Amino acid sequence: MSSRSSWSSTEQINRTISSRADDLPPQPRRLEVVSKQATRVTALSTKLEWKIEQFEKLMKLIKNGSNLISRMFSVPDAPTVCWELHVYPNGKRDEDVNNVSFFLRQVGLARGEEPIMTEFQIYALDANNQRVSVCRDTKDFTNQQGRGKFQVSRDKMLGALRSDGTLFLICEVEYFPPGSKISVEPVVDEDVSTEEQEEMPEVIVRANNRSMWEDELFTDCVIHVGNKHIKAHRCILGQNSPVFKSMFSSPNMIEAQKGEIHIEDAKYDSVRAMVEFMYTGATESLESQGNIDEILAIADKYEVLMLKDQCERLIAQTINLKNVTQIAMFSDTYTADYLKSAVIRFLTTHHRVVIKTQDWISLKKSRHELANELLEAVLSTDQDDDDVTSNIPISVSPPPARKRLRRSAK
């Protein structure tokens, strides 16, 4: 009886609650507005792969304090930030003997710019393609500053060598470019495909500009170089070159009246490369053209500064003991500041050898002010830098030969 009574009471309570709920007025529907947002953060990353042959012998035979320097590596999206890896096979200082010292060096920013907080790791791949860690760290970098020192024992490095005695080094660097901003943006509609999202608008614009130029669509001016010509658009030339803009803006100049430009002090290929850059922001196979110095000269004349900057960086990668003096004069002739800074960095390590060469002796006689400027800069860097290289450096794989640079433009 008690069980049936309990069930009846519960049923009655449920009915009462249901009845009261039915008696309540309908509740207003809640209007919910969702703002979908995303914080987009794009870090840049670059990677160096560097093979150093006969590294076991280098650890035994190289004097303490002598170093190897990699070629500069960077990201095209941030050309003002470049990196070098420095390796001392027998340690940097006296107390580092029997160790290998490693430094990562940032060589692109101008003096006074904000430091770049950077995450990086350096490791080797041994004979079994297994990683042998050198370091993993996060540090802030300013211009010309090497960060480290990271010490690895000689025994550990011996175990990191490939079967042929080669050291296969890898350096991975990740950072935010100078001036980067973190922004909050609306979320892209999920119905839009990933492929469409990744289709960068600027890529489409560049492709359209190239087609317009190559198809000579609505061109309104022509550039004469020798017996060849290049058709173009005044608006594109004027937008990218203050010199062309001045020509087309002056009604008394023949360029403005007839839309014809005659260039007699440059080669056709160099002028065409400059015009191509104005339309697309790039020049196909710039590194393989073999006339980077001529392209820089014409870019300097017509003040196409972004192209000039790219040429400076490419030439900087070719500096060696044989051409450093010529490149120094070239950089001074065309006020190529980045290239001159690269010369100074090279001299900081190599000055003891360079100042004994016949080219340097000739430079002191013909352009002594430039020679003094370079040496003063080397001394200044030597005092300010916390990673100063010293003694005679070793070049494991010398840069490829390139043609002699012109000393001046005609």
From Swiss-Prot:
Biased composition (Basic residues): 401-410
Quaternary organization: Interacts with cul-3.
Name of this protein: BTB and MATH domain-containing protein 42
Annotated region described as Disordered, given as residue ranges: 1-29, 389-410
Molecular function (Gene Ontology), one example: ubiquitin protein ligase binding
GO cellular component: cytoplasm; nucleus
Pfam families named among the record's database cross-references: BTB, MATH_2
Pathway, per record: Protein modification; protein ubiquitination
Keywords: Ubl conjugation pathway
Task performed by this protein: Probable substrate-specific adapter of an E3 ubiquitin-protein ligase complex which mediates the ubiquitination and subsequent proteasomal degradation of target proteins.
Primary gene name: bath-42
Domain of life: Eukaryota
Biased composition (Polar residues): 1-19
Organism: Caenorhabditis elegans
Domain MATH: 45-173
Domain BTB per the UniProt entry, residue ranges: 219-287
UniProt keyword Plastid present: no
An annotated GO BP: regulation of proteolysis
